[in-house]
Amino acid sequence: MNSLLMIIGCLVLIGTVWTKEGYLVNMKTGCKYGCYELGDNGYCDRKCKAESGNYGYCYTVGCWCEGLPNSKPTWPLPGKSCSGK
């Protein structure tokens, strides 16, 4: 029983360590996805889940996503500024 609890605990920890969070970024413009309804926000949550994240919400006028795979880029993109187009 103790071994099972240790294995489950390790799996939870691995899931936490191997994910990241950050502002969702539009790869074409280099800008973060904007939002105006702070807190729980259906638009941001849908965008986050479309990028394989766990949960998205509006934070300081941008869609913040938690639980993203490490392979997904977040704002700001290195070497690319927001063009606003």
UniProtKB/Swiss-Prot annotation:
It comes from the Eukaryota. The modification Serine amide is found at residue 83. One of its GO terms (molecular function) is sodium channel inhibitor activity. Expressed by the venom gland. Its main location: secreted. It is found in: Secreted. GO terms for cellular component: extracellular region. Residues 1-19 form the signal peptide. PROSITE patterns: LCN_CSAB (PS51863). Residues 20-83 form the LCN-type CS-alpha/beta domain. Disulfide bonds join 31-82, 35-58, 44-63, 48-65. Beta toxins bind voltage-independently at site-4 of sodium channels (Nav) and shift the voltage of activation toward more negative potentials thereby affecting sodium channel activation and promoting spontaneous and repetitive firing. This is Toxin Cll6.
